[in-house]
C-alpha cells in the first residue's frame, strides 16, 4: 500500500487536521471509536493509506499531533473524533511559541523535536511502502511556521526520497491575526522553497469569501473554513484510497505540476460549492464542474489566476463519469482561455478520475493549479516584511532567541527571487532564447551567442577566445 503519514503542527494545523480526520473517517465508514460501520468493501480496500489496523479491528489514524502548548491538543481530544488518535502520538510542550518563529524553530521547538521525530519514525516503520508525508500548519504563527518547517527539514534529511506535501495557511491580505505574521511567513517560505515538494497555499480571507459569497453562510466559523480545506485534502488523495479509472498520487502530481524545482507553490480549489438553498437548482455535470473549478472565486488563496498564467494544473474528478468527457472539457478550457496558459507547455492540465464521490455528492472535483499569479501572495507578504524590517521593528524578539539579522535578509531575498522567477516564466514565450537558464542576464546571453558564432566559423581561434 502507498501510505501517507499525516502531521499537524500548531493551533491552526491541529484544527484543520481534526476536521480532516472527521471527513476521511466519514468517507471510510469509521466511527469516532475507530470501528468500521460502512456499507461497501471499497471503503476498506485501501484504508491502510491513512489508517493502521490495531487489535480488535480498530482503525487508528497515521497521525502525529504536535504543539508547543497543551490547549489545542485538549480541544482535539475533546472533539468528536478525539478518541480515535493513538495517545502516544500527541506530542506537546508547555511554554508555547508566542507567535515567534524563532521560538518554534530554534529554542522551544528544537527541545521537542526529537520526541516528535521518534513518533514519526514509529509511524513510518509501520508502513509497508511509505509514499510520503503531509503536513498541516500555518505560516503566520510560531509553532506551525517555526517548528513545522524545522520538522519538515529534519524529515527531509531522514527520508530524502519520500514526498513532502504541505497544506500551508498563508497570511491573508486584509485580515491579520498577528502583527509579526510577515516575519514568520517569510522565514517559513524560505524553508519551504528548499525542503518541501508540494505546498498547497490556503488563506483565511479567501475561505471567508467562499463561505460568505458562494455558500451564503452569514457567520462562518473556523469549523466551516476547515471543512473547505479538508475537502481539498481528501480530494488530493482519493485516488490512493479508492479505485479509479485514472489514478494519481503525490509523486505523479509533483511530476506533472512542477516544471522548475523552486516553483512548487499551488493554488487549490474545490467544486461544486453551492449554498444549501440553491443545490436543487444546479445540475452536476462535468462542464459545470470544470467551469466552476477554474473560477477565480473558487480559489482558496487570495491570488487571482486572471492576473497570471497557468504553468500547469491538475483536476481530480470524483464520481461516475466518462473520462472522454473529462478530457474534452480540459482541452476545451485550454483552447478557450489559451492566453491564461503558457504556450511552451502543451497540454498542461493533468486529470484523474476516481469512482467514489465524496459523501453527499454525485460528483466533485479538486483543482490544483501552478499559476504565476501566486506571486501576488508573496509580494504582499514581502512588502509588509520590508516595511517592518527596514525599521528593525519587533526584531529583538527574534534575535533574543539567538537568530541573526542575516537570516532575515536571506529569507527576504529568497522570497523576492521566487517572485521574479514566477514573473520571468509568466512573460516567457515559446520563441524566447532562454536556454532553460534561470538567472541569465542579456550580456551573458550575448556572450554565449558570440561563443557559438566563433565555434561555428573559426574553430582554430575558438580556444584562445574562450580562455
UniProtKB/Swiss-Prot annotation:
GTP binds at residues 11, 69, 138, 142-144, 204, 226. Residues 429-448 are annotated as: Disordered. Residues 429-444 have a biased composition (Acidic residues). It is found in: Cytoplasm, Cytoskeleton, Spindle; Nucleus. InterPro entries: Beta-tubulin_BS, Beta_tubulin, Tub_FtsZ_C, Tubulin, Tubulin/FtsZ-like_C, Tubulin/FtsZ_2-layer-sand-dom, Tubulin/FtsZ_GTPase_sf, Tubulin_C. The keyword Cytoplasm applies. Keywords: Cytoplasm, Cytoskeleton, GTP-binding, Magnesium, Metal-binding, Microtubule, Nucleotide-binding, Nucleus. Pfam families: Tubulin, Tubulin_C. Its cofactor is Mg(2+). The keyword Nucleus applies. Mg(2+) binds at residue 69. One of its GO terms (biological process) is microtubule-based process. SUPFAM superfamilies: Tubulin C-terminal domain-like (SSF55307), Tubulin nucleotide-binding domain-like (SSF52490). GO terms for molecular function: GTP binding; GTPase activity; metal ion binding; structural constituent of cytoskeleton. GO terms for cellular component: cytoplasm; microtubule; nucleus; spindle. Belongs to the tubulin family. Dimer of alpha and beta chains. A typical microtubule is a hollow water-filled tube with an outer diameter of 25 nm and an inner diameter of 15 nM. Alpha-beta heterodimers associate head-to-tail to form protofilaments running lengthwise along the microtubule wall with the beta-tubulin subunit facing the microtubule plus end conferring a structural polarity. Microtubules usually have 13 protofilaments but different protofilament numbers can be found in some organisms and specialized cells. Tubulin is the major constituent of microtubules, a cylinder consisting of laterally associated linear protofilaments composed of alpha- and beta-tubulin heterodimers. Microtubules grow by the addition of GTP-tubulin dimers to the microtubule end, where a stabilizing cap forms. Below the cap, tubulin dimers are in GDP-bound state, owing to GTPase activity of alpha-tubulin. PANTHER family: TUBULIN (PTHR11588). This is Tubulin beta-1 chain. The lineage of its organism: Eukaryota, Amoebozoa, Evosea, Eumycetozoa, Myxogastria.
Amino acid at each position: 500500500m502507498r501510505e501517507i503519514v499525516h502531521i499537524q503542527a500548531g493551533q491552526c494545523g491541529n484544527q484543520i487536521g481534526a476536521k480532516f480526520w472527521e471527513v476521511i473517517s466519514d468517507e471510510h465508514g469509521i466511527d469516532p471509536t475507530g470501528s468500521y460501520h460502512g456499507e461497501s468493501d471499497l471503503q476498506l480496500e485501501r484504508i491502510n493509506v491513512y489508517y493502521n489496523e490495531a487489535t480488535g479491528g480498530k482503525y487508528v489514524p497515521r497521525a502525529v499531533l504536535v504543539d508547543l502548548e497543551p490547549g489545542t491538543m485538549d480541544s482535539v481530544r475533546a472533539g468528536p473524533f478525539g478518541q480515535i488518535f493513538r495517545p502516544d502520538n500527541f506530542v506537546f510542550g508547555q511554554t508555547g511559541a508566542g507567535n515567534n518563529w524563532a521560538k518554534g524553530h530554534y529554542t522551544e521547538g528544537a527541545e521537542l523535536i526529537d520526541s516528535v521525530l521518534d513518533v514519526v519514525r514509529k509511524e513510518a516503520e509501520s508502513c509497508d511502502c511509505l509514499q510520503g508525508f503531509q503536513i498541516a500548519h500555518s505560516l503566520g504563527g510560531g509553532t506551525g511556521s517555526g517548528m513545522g518547517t524545522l520538522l519538515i527539514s529534519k524529515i527531509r534529511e531522514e527520508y530524502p526520497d519520500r514526498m513532502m506535501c504541505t497544506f500551508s495557511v498563508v497570511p491573508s491580505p486584509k485580515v491579520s491575526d498577528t502583527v509579526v505574521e510577515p516575519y514568520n511567513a517569510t522565514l517559513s517560505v524560505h524553508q519551504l522553497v528548499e525542503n518541501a515538494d508540494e505546498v498547497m497555499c490556503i488563506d483565511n480571507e479567501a475561505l471567508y469569501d467562499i463561505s460568505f459569497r458562494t455558500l451564503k453562510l452569514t457567520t462562518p466559523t473556523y469549523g466551516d473554513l476547515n471543512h473547505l480545506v479538508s475537502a481539498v485534502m481528501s480530494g488530493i488523495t482519493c485516488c490512493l484510497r479508492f479505485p479509479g479509472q485514472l489514478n494519481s498520487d503525490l509523486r505523479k502530481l509533483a511530476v506533472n505540476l512542477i516544471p522548475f524545482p523552486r516553483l512548487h507553490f499551488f493554488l487549490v480549489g474545490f467544486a461544486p460549492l453551492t449554498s444549501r438553498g440553491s443545490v436543487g437548482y444546479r445540475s452536476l455535470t462535468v462542464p459545470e464542474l470544470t467551469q466552476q473549478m477554474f473560477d477565480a472565486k473558487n480559489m482558496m488563496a487570495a491570488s487571482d489566476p486572471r492576473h497570471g498564467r497557468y504553468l500547469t494544473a491538475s483536476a481530480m474528478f470524483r464520481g461516475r463519469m466518462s473520462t472522454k468527457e473529462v478530457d474534452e472539457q480540459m482541452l476545451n478550457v485550454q483552447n478557450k482561455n489559451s492566453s491564461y496558459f503558457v504556450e511552451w507547455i502543451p497540454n498542461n492540465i493533468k486529470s484523474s478520475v476516481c469512482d467514489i464521490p465524496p459523501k453527499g455528492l454525485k460528483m466533485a472535483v479538486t483543482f490544483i493549479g501552478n499559476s504565476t499569479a501566486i506571486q501576488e501572495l508573496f509580494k504582499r507578504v514581502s512588502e509588509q516584511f520590508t516595511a517592518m524590517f527596514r525599521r528593525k521593528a519587533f526584531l529583538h524578539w527574534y534575535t533574543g532567541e539567538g537568530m541573526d539579522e542575516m537570516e532575515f535578509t536571506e529569507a527576504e531575498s529568497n522570497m523576492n527571487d521566487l517572485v521574479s522567477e514566477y514573473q520571468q516564466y509568466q512573460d516567457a514565450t515559446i520563441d524566447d532564447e532562454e536556454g532553460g537558464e534561470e538567472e541569465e542576464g542579456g550580456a551573458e546571453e550575448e556572450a554565449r551567442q558570440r561563443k557559438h558564432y566563433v565555434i561555428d566559423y573559426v574553430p582554430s581561434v575558438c580556444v584562445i577566445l574562450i580562455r
